[in-house]
């Protein structure tokens, strides 16, 4: 759909996308969605923007779940993106499904620095670029309060953004009417803000 509209679509793998060893995996889980991954994404974006066929002023980012978290992290800690779509992001590991949060980050009392460093709620006021934030209201994996708390901080900072909630949809927003609507909404957003 995006290619048909003339967009270039690129996917970057950051250093914690795949772990080479159990030791590395254990180290990486303690810094999920942290500054090192963002440095990797920014390096990739700098390369992309240096290509003659790319308009460096019209670069966007999007992701779902963990990718949605990277989108928010990138948009609140860099000025590289004109717009971003974040679907079902983890904004604070305290709000994430305990089973997965403690698997990835350990318990909050065992990794307080990790939880603090990976909370995007506190950096919402630094948002650069236009954001479309999307969440299913029945998401039992990444609870909607992740988005609500992020939105509350955007409102406090008087930052304009777009938001779409899908009632009675879970994490995957997987039924055809909702998924088709979501992709059309995202395309409409790109056309307006990129």
Where are these regions (language model features)?
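Cap/lid segment of the alpha/beta-hydrolase catalytic domain
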Residues: 1-64, 91-102
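Active-site loop/turn elements of alpha/beta-hydrolase fold enzymes
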Residues: 14, 89, 166-168
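Short glycine-enriched nucleophile-adjacent loop
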Residues: 68-79
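Mobile cap/lid helix-loop segments that gate and shape the active-site cleft of serine hydrolases
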Residues: 83, 89-129, 156
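Short beta-strand/loop motif that positions the catalytic acidic residue
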Residues: 127, 133-135, 139
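Conserved alpha/beta-hydrolase "acid-adjacent" motif
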Residues: 140-149
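C-terminal catalytic histidine-bearing segment of alpha/beta-hydrolase fold enzymes
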Residues: 148-149, 155-194
